[in-house]
Amino acid sequence: MAQSDITIDALSKVGQQDAEYLVSLVRSVPGFPKEGIIFRDFMPVLADPKGLKILLKALEEALPVSPSEFDSIAGLESRGFLFGPVMAAHLGKGFIAVRKAGKLPPETIGESYDLEYGTASVEIETDAVQAGKRVLIVDDLIATGGTAKAATDLIEKAGGTVVGFSFVMRLDGLDGLDKLDGKPSSSLIAMPA
């Protein structure tokens, strides 16, 4: 699939040349992980020093809310772990790891969500979110929105408030943004599902 199907969204905040450079690094892999799926691989962005610098700059410049409006960044396993802690450190915020079930030591709290063929769960440690903490959720991709919604429910169950979402990529046509309850969100690039 050609890169021409990728729309520069909030990525434009870093300038056209840098935006086009970053998009050129995103690899489309048809048939992975199964037939009918086009996997959008942004690992080449992380391997490229210039691409990584552009990505982190763009994520910070395209925040859906001001840094003064959140206390912590929650990164969703696994690719949200790649840039969430770096963003948190650079912005002077804490980082919350939202993990797949069974990956954290007790005590944890969890939230289940539906998949196409079953269910999955995400967890955080019980002391990761204090009452009233304001959280920005970051991840590489929003598709159906199930994981982002489960992470929101989990953080709110723990007493926190999700104030927004920051995604590298958004797959259009899957209505994932509809599950974010109208909270502010940003995505750097948009692609067809």
From Swiss-Prot:
Pfam family, any one: Pribosyltran
EC number: 2.4.2.7
Annotated GO biological process: adenine salvage; AMP salvage; purine ribonucleoside salvage
Superkingdom of origin: Bacteria
PROSITE patterns: PUR_PYR_PR_TRANSFER
Keywords: Cytoplasm, Glycosyltransferase, Purine salvage, Transferase
Cell compartment(s), UniProt: Cytoplasm
SUPFAM superfamilies per the UniProt record, alphabetical: PRTase-like
UniProt keyword Glycoprotein, yes or no: no
Pathway: Purine metabolism; AMP biosynthesis via salvage pathway; AMP from adenine: step 1/1
This protein's GO CC annotations: cytoplasm
Catalytic reactions of this protein: AMP + diphosphate = 5-phospho-alpha-D-ribose 1-diphosphate + adenine
An annotated Gene Ontology molecular function: AMP binding
Subunit structure as annotated in this protein's UniProt entry: Homodimer.
HAMAP family in the record: Aden_phosphoribosyltr
UniProt-recorded name of the protein: Adenine phosphoribosyltransferase
Source organism (scientific name): Bifidobacterium longum (strain NCC 2705)
Taxon lineage: Bacteria, Bacillati, Actinomycetota, Actinomycetes, Bifidobacteriales
